[in-house]
């Protein structure tokens, strides 16, 4: 559900962002956005099928989101064919980066880092490769933007995390972590009652 809402917002916002500047360009932007999303979902799901022999809806939806993120930087600058290529590459970016994070034992249960960080970097660089102003100079500008943005986010994020850690703390107790934060902090003991029963039955085979 979250992925569907996120996809709808990305498609709407990509088209809406150019509406006031050039209404005619809005249709091109929306078409490019949808093409990239479809290509990302198909390539990511297909790659998962090849490696694991089964379909995975979360990987498909993250591929869709990866395609949306990948095209966002240049949705109004691309030909439809370029949008398909960008989206199609975004799928493997999501799949491979998800696998790397899992092997590194970095916790990212919803795949936000592969979708937003890695596909964001790819999409930013793609403007210099496929965009209407594509050139070596433009690619280097895009690369510099990735570096500057990365440094800013790391510095700002570190400061914010350290402030939160000093004032309130970031870790919960082991008991709260074991029970789940929905229960320990939000009194959500009944929110997933049926899901827990179903999940236990599935894993026990009964």
Predicted regions and their residues:
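Transmembrane alpha-helical segments of multi-pass membrane transport proteins and ion-pumping complexes
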Residues: 7, 15, 36-49, 64-71, ...
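Structural signature of hydrophobic alpha-helical transmembrane segments
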Residues: 25-38, 79-90
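Helix-coil boundary and interhelical linker segments in multi-pass alpha-helical membrane proteins
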Residues: 16-25, 72-82, 132-133
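Membrane-helix interface "capping/anchor" motifs
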Residues: 48-58, 79, 101-108
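Structural signal for the N-terminal portions of transmembrane helices
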Residues: 25, 29, 134-151
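Extramembrane terminal tails and long inter-domain/linker segments of multi-pass membrane proteins
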Residues: 164-206
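Cytoplasmic-side transmembrane-helix entry/capping segments in multi-pass membrane proteins
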Residues: 54-65, 109-115
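Single conserved hydrophobic/aromatic residue that forms the stacking wall/gate
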Residues: 1-11
